């Protein structure tokens, strides 16, 4: 048993020793392989490091070469720029040298001129001294010979010169006044003609009677009433004469006051429509008619101010303005006349650069006094000035009202324009009844003269008789004949008619060729 154990121990020891040596040899073999591998790795690392070192050296050399090249190029550029600057500085220096030389020459020349001027000044002063001495000697000699002092001689010469010049100045002033007057006349005519052509105003002939139509003649008896009480009541309340004659189905109202006449017409119309006609009903209808007329007057005033473009009038003044519709002057409606004057004055003011709206306002109100001149003492000019002052109108408007008939001196251009527009509107052919017949006769005579020639188809007198247009037959009158016809008609007008201004004769020859495509 013991031997077995010993044998086992010996085997174990021997196995351990053998295992130790085996492991040692294996470890040494591994260590040797590792060393060889490490040496190989070290060698490869050395080779890689050498390659990197060479590559880095090459890159460094390339960078150094590149930097050197750039530096050399930069140095060359700087040298070139410095050379250019040096050249420019040298050029400037040369220019400065030349300028300095020129300035030196100029300074020398100026010094020479100054010296010459000083010498000339001294010479002039010497000459002036000699001249003064000679003048004094001559004055003394002249005073001795003429027996006049210097002041007396001056006065004598000035008087002679003044006499000679005064005549020349007077002639020049007269010529200037003549030219100015001619130019002013031309300008005034141009402005007036333009204003007249641009102003288109309608006109209605006014009469002193109104006619009320009746449904039948039996109504006349009802209007007269028992023992004439109805007609007397109506005449008493309105102040209008009722004329009931043989005129069928009509009653004539006659009166000088258009407002009363209009009141009577409205009242009578209402009575006829109502059918109940007796004094109490008449009084009621007359009251209604008066209120309607008052309202109509106010509306007319407002419409007129709107039409003319005048704003800001006092309400009472607007109502007074509306009353002008029922006033006439030589048959011309005063409200229409005032509107026409307003537009004419405004047009002329615009041409002259004046306030057009203020001129319209003054023209519209210039005859405002005529609305109540039959109710208040004084002329329509005085009443108009009082009204305009009362309602605080513009001073130019007040002066225009006061001066439009020459009673007061105009203080503004607008006042003069209003007076001119008033004269134009009143004198316009056809505006007032006293000139209407002559005006129509002259227009008819113009057309009669034109149509008396063979080949004339139709003639028209237009522009208030300032032009006649003749339409001729083209198959009878050629172009040359048209000129001859115009001259012949012009001669006959000059020989046979009396007219203001001039008349334009226009011959119109028209040929038409018409075809129809089917």
Curated annotation (Swiss-Prot):
Domain KH, chain residue ranges per copy: 208-271
Biological process according to GO: mRNA catabolic process
One cellular component (GO) term of this entry: plasma membrane
EC number(s) reported in the record: 3.1.-.-
UniProt cross-references to InterPro entries, sorted A to Z: HD/PDEase_dom, HD_domain, HDIG_dom, KH_dom, KH_dom_type_1, KH_dom_type_1_sf, Ribonuclease_Y, RNase_Y_N
Gene Ontology MF terms in the entry: RNA binding; RNA endonuclease activity
Class of this enzyme: hydrolase
PROSITE patterns: HD, KH_TYPE_1
Regions crossing the membrane: 2-22
Keywords of the record: Cell membrane, Endonuclease, Hydrolase, Membrane, Nuclease, RNA-binding, Transmembrane, Transmembrane helix
Subcellular locations according to the entry: Cell membrane
Domain HD: 334-427
Gene3D superfamilies referenced in this protein's UniProt entry, alphabetically: Hypothetical protein af1432 (1.10.3210.10), K Homology domain, type 1 (3.30.1370.10)
Keyword Transmembrane helix: yes
CDD domains given in the database record: HDc (cd00077), KH-I_RNaseY (cd22431)
Chief location: membrane
Family statement drawn from the similarity comment of this UniProt entry: Belongs to the RNase Y family.
Stated role: Endoribonuclease that initiates mRNA decay.
Name of protein: Ribonuclease Y
Organism: Geobacillus thermodenitrificans (strain NG80-2)
Gene field: rny
């Amino acid at each position: 048993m013991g031997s077995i154990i010993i044998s086992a121990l010996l085997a174990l020891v021997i196995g351990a020793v053998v295992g130790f040596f085996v492991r040692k040899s294996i470890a040494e073999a591994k260590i040797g392989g590792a060393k060889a591998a490490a040496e190989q790795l070290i060698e490869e690392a050395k080779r890689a490091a050498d390659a990197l070192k060479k590559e880095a050296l090459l890159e460094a050399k390339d960078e150094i070469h590149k930097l050197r090249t750039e530096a050399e190029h930069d140095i060359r550029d700087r040298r070139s720029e410095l050379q250019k600057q040096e050249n420019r500085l040298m050029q400037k220096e040369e220019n400065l040298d030349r300028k300095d030389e020129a300035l030196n020459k100029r300074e020398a020349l100026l010094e020479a001129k100054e010296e010459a001027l000083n010498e000339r000044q001294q010479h002039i002063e010497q000459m002036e001294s000699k001249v003064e001495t000679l003048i004094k000697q001559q004055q003394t000699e002249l005073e001795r010979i003429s027996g006049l002092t210097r002041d007396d001689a001056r006065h004598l010469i000035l008087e002679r010169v003044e006499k000679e010049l005064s005549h020349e100045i007077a002639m020049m002033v007269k010529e200037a006044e003549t030219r100015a007057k001619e130019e002013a006349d031309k300008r005034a005519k141009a402005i007036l003609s333009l204003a007249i052509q641009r102003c288109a105003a309608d006109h209605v002939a006014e009469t002193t009677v109104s006619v009320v139509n009746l449904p039948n003649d039996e109504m006349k008896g009802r209007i007269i009433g028992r023992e004439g009480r109805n007609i007397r009541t109506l005449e008493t309340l309105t102040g209008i004469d009722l004329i009931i004659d043989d005129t069928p189905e009509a009653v004539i109202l006659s009166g000088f006051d258009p407002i009363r006449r209009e009141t009577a017409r409205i009242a009578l119309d209402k009575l006829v429509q109502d059918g109940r006609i007796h004094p109490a009903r008449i009084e009621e209808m007359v009251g209604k008619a008066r209120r309607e007329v008052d309202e109509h007057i106010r509306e007319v005033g407002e419409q007129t101010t709107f039409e003319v473009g005048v704003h800001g009038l006092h309400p009472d003044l607007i109502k007074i303005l509306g009353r002008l519709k029922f006033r006439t002057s030589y048959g011309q409606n005063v409200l229409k006349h005032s509107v026409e004057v307003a537009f004419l004055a405004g047009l002329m003011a615009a041409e002259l650069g004046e306030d057009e709206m203020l001129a319209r306002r003054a023209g519209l109100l210039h005859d405002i006094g005529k609305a109540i001149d039959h109710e208040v003492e004084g002329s329509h000019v005085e009443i108009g000035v009082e009204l305009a002052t009362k309602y605080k109108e513009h001073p130019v408007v007040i002066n225009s009202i006061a001066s439009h008939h020459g009673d007061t001196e105009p203080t503004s251009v607008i006042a003069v324009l209003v007076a001119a527009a008033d004269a134009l509107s009143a004198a316009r052919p056809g505006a007032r009844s006293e000139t209407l017949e002559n005006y129509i006769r002259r227009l008819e005579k113009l057309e009669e003269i034109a149509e008396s020639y063979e080949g004339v188809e139709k003639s028209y007198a237009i522009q208030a008789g300032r032009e006649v247009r003749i339409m001729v037959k083209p198959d009878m009158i050629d172009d040359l004949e048209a000129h001859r016809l115009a001259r012949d008609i012009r001669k006959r007008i000059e020989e046979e008619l009396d007219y203001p201004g001039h008349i334009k004769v226009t011959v119109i020859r028209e040929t038409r060729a018409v075809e129809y495509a089917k």
